[in-house]
Amino acid sequence: MFAKLETYPAALLELVATANDAAKAIPPLFPLSSSVAVNPFLGQTEEPLAVTAARLARVGGTKIMPERAHWAAKLEAGDITETDLTEALAALKGRFNCPSLDDVKAALTVPSPTPQALPTVAELAADVSGLDWPALIEDRISAWAAGHFDEGQALWQQAKTGGTFSAWRDFAARDLTPEIQGLSGFCAFVAATNRSHWRAIGRASERLNLGTEAASTAFHRWLMTLGGWAQYGRYLLWQDELNGAQNSTVTELLAIRMVFDEALFALYEDQISARWAEVVAAHQTPVTPTPDLVIDAIWQDAAERAEQRRLAETLQSGAVQPVEGRAEVQAAFCIDVRSEVFRRALEAQDRQIETLGFAGFFGLASAHKAAGSDVVETRGPVLLQAGVSSQAKEAEELDLDRRYSARAKRAWGRFKLAAVSSFAFVEASGPLYAGELIRDSLLLGGKTKAEPAPALDPSISLATRIQMAKTVLTAMSLTSDFAKLVVLAGHGADVTNSPHESALQCGACGGHAGDVNARLLAALLNDRDVQKGLRDQGIEIPSDTVFLPALHHTTTDEVTLYEQDLSSYALQISEATRGKLKGWLTEAGRLARAERAQRLPRASSEASVHMRARDWAETRPEWGLAGCRAFVAAPRARTSGADLGGQAFLHNYVWQRDEGFGVLELILTAPVVVASWISLQYYGSTVAPAQFGGGNKLLHNVVGGIGVLEGNTGAPRAGLPWQSVHDGDKVQHDPLRLSVVIEAPREAMSEILSRHPGVRALFDNGWLHLIAMDDEGKLAWRYRGDLKWSRFDAPQSTPSALAAE
């Protein structure tokens, strides 16, 4: 990503730094095989919503807050009160020129203005020529990029030596399409560019009269026109930065885009130079929100405060006493909001059932190889590097069978895509799929054989395993009072014929199901040598406690128990409890499906919920995390009696057991951040689907194994498809920024935020809300930013409510 600084003049070095900053303003697009939720505002977390709204209006013509009719409806329904509005208005004072309360309310009668991005040279040239130059540029870059970035879908791979810009330069110098469309001499123009993409950026900037101040948002603007290609380049940069390496793909793509505009400027300079000078002058001005954007930000904050009031009431009415004595079953689920519905249903089966919430990778981020495969899957959060390696091993004969089957499947896939056979494939082979289609539609298919148990490979020392087990149990607030049976339930989704399948899997497991992580941890905790080591460190696991790995299928609310992983002794001592558990899980699944069916279109029966997982044409097999709005880290007793509607991330946390607040620090810096990415992806895909959404599933075509096109051309679409947030009648996700509720001392949270400026920025700039719960389970304190707090129930305009830490 970084240039060799000693080889460039000072003026170019300033542009290099600006280009690198622009690259980081773009969110990453993870490939379909390991797709995870990404915060579309990742590069803007250092500024508040209103400023980001102004920035994205300038560089993308993007509106990132709901229409005012949305808030007007909430106000009329009583969901937003005048108190909410007054507090939101008071909270914004000092940052911007704030309007009066009357002005804020009056604004609802007028639609907010539609933002217009500053035009590129290509758009100005299109205006004077009548030729759609932006579309041509998108088409030619996409035609090249689809092959250049291909991850195995294409039969013929492009050469990738020399870097992204160099590869495009070789392609474009021979691509006659722009010249045929009227961009005369373009091939020669490209051939004359320097092979250094930094030199190309420098030359184009000079030719277009771009100084450093104007380049900041101008570079961002050009990258926005590249859509998913720039975002995939940002993913490559993200991955290399995790490994301490460098990557210049995004800035090389910027150079490619600028070369097009440089060539167009040379062709149309006489007609557009005056207008382009105005654009450059506009890029030089500071990014400042308009009064309309400030008003919209106030309404957004008011809606979130209203939701926090309702959350406080729900939690107060739902608090229950914890299980007395030893629980018969403890079931640990991922904090994913989909688990909340099932946990509530399971706890309703018997008072001796206790559920826990923890990040779905269960503290073991693993670089994993499935049985019969050499492909390494990162089964952990994208924020972390894998801490261990694992592999699912089986007998050599079975391993070879899997490999031969996989090769045959790949060969069949290549036959489908080959230049000649692809034309006749549907007519010749379509009938072969009829049986499979009928079988799946009637739910007659057999269950997929479970993977063999994963094991750490290479193995690690006993001392390391003991420390790992202690760390995980401490983070789960599970260091005493173990039940007879402790279920460790990862989660995964069962969907058919969906390019976005990995987006419904466990985000904490890198877009994979959580079965591997659950099975690894269960094996670790069932190890008698590990238990002895834990006992020496003060964690006593009873001799009759068994850890049972499981997988919660979120599409069907069924649970797979990996009993085959247990020893004969563990099977024997847990037989009676496992028998009860299976009955409880069956009934809990029935209740959970009935609750979820109320939101799902055409889900009138329990069978129809199952059918969605196997239906090849189903665009909404489940709602995923649509509706997520809160994150609660507290003892389960604070939430177990509350119906949170499958809209809250629930993390077990007992601060009194957290010596030094290391677990609290982990929660704030890892699962809270991951949850914010999820929440803001749903937010962005709902309020700005054209920019941050994945488009219409019915029009999707996979490109390069990276992402999807909407149609057969253009750039990959990032974010969630429209069907993932909209039921055909109304949106299923209320665009609210996440409210994080933690039962812990404010001083400890402030101290942690002071050590992590990136996390603090999320709260200081309002991308997340932070609320402290007191020891009675009440929402007591609200984080105000700048390490200051105010009482949750106090009007925000009351100075005496402030408490600096």
From Swiss-Prot:
The record's annotation in Pfam families points to: DabA
According to its record, how does it sit in the membrane?
Answer: Peripheral membrane protein
Positions with a binding annotation for Zn(2+): 334, 336, 491, 506
Keyword terms, alphabetized: Cell inner membrane, Cell membrane, Membrane, Metal-binding, Transport, Zinc
Q: Where in the cell is it found?
A: Cell inner membrane
User: Required cofactors, per record?
Assistant: Zn(2+)
InterPro entries xrefs = DabA
Quote the cellular component terms of the Gene Ontology held in the record. Answer: plasma membrane
Molecular functions (GO terms): zinc ion binding
Which family, according to UniProt?
A: Belongs to the inorganic carbon transporter (TC 9.A.2) DabA family.
Q: What functional role does this protein have?
A: Part of an energy-coupled inorganic carbon pump.
What interactions and quaternary structure are annotated? Forms a complex with DabB.
Q: What name is this protein filed under?
A: Probable inorganic carbon transporter subunit DabA
Record organism: Ruegeria sp. (strain TM1040) (Silicibacter sp.)
What high-level taxonomic lineage is stated for the organism? Answer: Bacteria, Pseudomonadati, Pseudomonadota, Alphaproteobacteria, Rhodobacterales
Provide the gene name from the record. Answer: dabA
